[in-house]
Amino acid sequence: MTDLIGFYSDHKIAAPLAIAQRSAKFKPFAAEIARRGILQIATCARLEFYGEKSVLEDIDGKPFFGFSYGRVEGAISIAERLATIAAGVHSQILGEGFISGQLMQAIESGDPNLSIFKVARVAVDLGSAARKRQEFFAEFDYVQIVEDIIADRFSDKAPLDRIYIIGAGMLGQELIRGNVGERFRSTVVITRNPKKLRKRLNTGPKTNVTFMRPSEVGRTREPGSMVVIATTDVDNKYKAILQETLLRLGPRIILDLSSIPVLTREAIGELDYVNMYGDEFLRFIEQNNQRLAPKLPLVVSDIKAALGAAV
């Protein structure tokens, strides 16, 4: 397993938006890359490849053209990096819990008998355990961010309309389960295929959730509404449809939680638009990271000790 190597770039090395855009280009090829015996980690904040040196020789640097990137060699060094990623040490939001699930999805797409996937599975378990032992948990999550922005933007006594959620992947489902629409008249999930999505989410908790196509939204203006964008699965055609829909609706605020902003401030006119790269969102991250920074060396030491005991 000493022939294992890895190449990586993340938000610490390159501009976060640039990484998100490059990562998005590789996501559709995840299954194909996994079949080649390569562990690909393509998230909004990182693009990484791990595997046998003989398999990765022709990849060295190519996915990172125009970017700075790092290289790691050997099973132990790779396990340490993957474990610290799983613990949230390398996340933009320190201590966030999404990344371990994303890692497991990537691992499960590969051959469990290959060395790299065995190493990665152990690393995720060690990193997740260290995160729990050191209580390295983000002070807030996306549900909390949405709730804080609701409290700020809807502090008056004006009646609320509906909250609209675009996207029902991991993040969209978390927002629904977190009941962020509690203060609103109802929660609406905007989707191009209501029937399919309704069936997929049917096993979740019973909440006041309805499903609507974009064409059904905005038939009357709702100045007391809020829109949360929780997906990156938006091509140019769908983006134009959503833009037209939101201009008709006229919500009080549009909160874009996608790693690649779906809209621009110019496109939505005078509507209040907040995305993950704006000062308001970055303040949430800064406050969380300042609180958790003293725990970083403790988590890393914990992981190194656990790795030492495991080999």
Curated annotation (Swiss-Prot):
Keywords: Nodulation, Plasmid. Gene3D superfamilies: Glutamyl-tRNA reductase, N-terminal domain (3.30.460.30), NAD(P)-binding Rossmann-like Domain (3.40.50.720). SUPFAM superfamilies: Glutamyl tRNA-reductase catalytic, N-terminal domain (SSF69742). It comes from the Bacteria. InterPro entries: GluRdtase_N_sf (IPR036343). One of its GO terms (molecular function) is NADP binding. GO terms for biological process: tetrapyrrole biosynthetic process. Signal peptide: none annotated. Responsible for the nodulation efficiency and competitive ability of strain GR4 on alfalfa roots. This is Protein nfe2.
